[in-house]
Amino acid sequence: MTEKIRVRYAPSPTGHLHIGNARTAIFNWLFARHYNGQFIIRIEDTDLARNVKDGEKSQLDNLQWLGIDWDEGPDKANSKYAPYRQTERAAQGVYQKYIDELLASGKAYKSYKTEATLKEEREAQAQAHQAPHYVYEYAGMTKEQIKDAQAKDEAAGLKSVVRFRVPENHDYQWQDLVKGEVKINSKEIGGDWVIQKADGMPTYNFAVVIDDHLMEITHVLRGDDHVSNTPKQLMVYEAFGWKAPAFGHMALIIKAETGKKLSKRDEDTLQFIEQYRELGYLPEAMFNFIGLLGWSPVGENEIFTREQFKEMFDENRFTKANAKFDAKKLAWVNNQWMRSEKEKVMPQLIHELVKAGLINDQQAKNDADHLAKIIEIAGVDGIKATSEIAPLAEYPFFKLHDISKEDRQSWLETDDGQKVAAAFTEKIKALAEDEFKAGHILQIIRDLQHDLQIKGRPLWNPIRLITTHEVQGPNLPEILAVMGKDWTIKNIQLTVAV
């Protein structure tokens, strides 16, 4: 591309970073980085009632965790475009200037209709099987009559909003980066719409145009649910005679199991970045998975780094079909990343043992190599998130279960069980410290199989029980070798004492 790319991610601080919003941020970031453009963060915080404490901080923190940086934003202001919060821009009169222009030109007007009146109109339209639309209250009036009516409403203490006058029967069309040509007639808009609320704040569809124009945004990549907003925004661009940016509306994200739209209100589905962070998913894996929601790379590979995404990004490879959010696929992607980055992830895995109360911080620091071996044997290659390692490693590495009465009767109180337990104990005690390795321990068990003519569970279960108090678990010789001779003998003595 020859023009200088400027794209933005403009979250509302009304909650945590959602999978859908993260995708918007990721693809705008990739677009900017691929074309050596600029990626801007703008905070759209005009919905004061819904803004939550630390909402902005949470959004930005999770973006950084995903590996997304920005060229401009609330913390990286460029004086030419600042400020980067809409409330601050509103306080400076940025939007009021343009609202006044539209009022003066007659392209917008003040409306004093109450919520009760609007509700009655919507109900009447529903009963008449009509699409909801705004009914112009000054129809047939002269300018003087309108002025008098508004003065009376003002005197009565009614609050006004400002509505944009929608052109009649006008087609708004654009060449969408994802969907191709899109055309929507003004009749589908729902009538004149609010550009300034009663509290003086601009509405989303108005403020976003002013901001994108003043910040020289060249491309707007966002979710498919914004298609219906685009005609409203285009009519504002037309009203001021401004060039609109290129629009791209990415495919809807749906749940793989149900085919329904991924909804923030669906509490049965984990769909916020913060939730996956808490579970121990890796940022590289989250970026990787989200980067394939509605975008298709060349070839069959599904595991990519951020740098690879940046290099191969192509806006022509967005898919039109709905993107499936598959939690199992995300778990698989995270597992692949954990396995390939095991050394890098190991400190996080060890920290999970600290969080679970299995070790303290000092042990985590001093015994890192030993703990890494435990984690490896416990089955790290099979988990989908780091938080799953503590339950796997807890027994028998840090705690021992009580041997059940049933297991004791089945495997330790039989003639064969007693023979195996006694013979293994004798041989393991005789094994030198420097030979206490998995290979030597396995050979002892094989020799017992030959000498006692006992094999399978009757051989292995008594040994497992006296050493780990479990009849199932990871590779037994490896467990004993890692935990050491003293630990093994101590457990055997504990079993005999019981």
From Swiss-Prot:
Residue numbers binding ATP: 264
S-S bridge residues: none
GO MF annotations, alphabetized: ATP binding; glutamate-tRNA ligase activity; tRNA binding; zinc ion binding
Protein's UniProt keywords contain Phosphoprotein: no
Keyword Cell division: no
Any matching Pfam family: tRNA-synt_1c
GO cellular component annotations of the record: cytosol
Biological role: Catalyzes the attachment of glutamate to tRNA(Glu) in a two-step reaction: glutamate is first activated by ATP to form Glu-AMP and then transferred to the acceptor end of tRNA(Glu).
Record protein name field: Glutamate--tRNA ligase
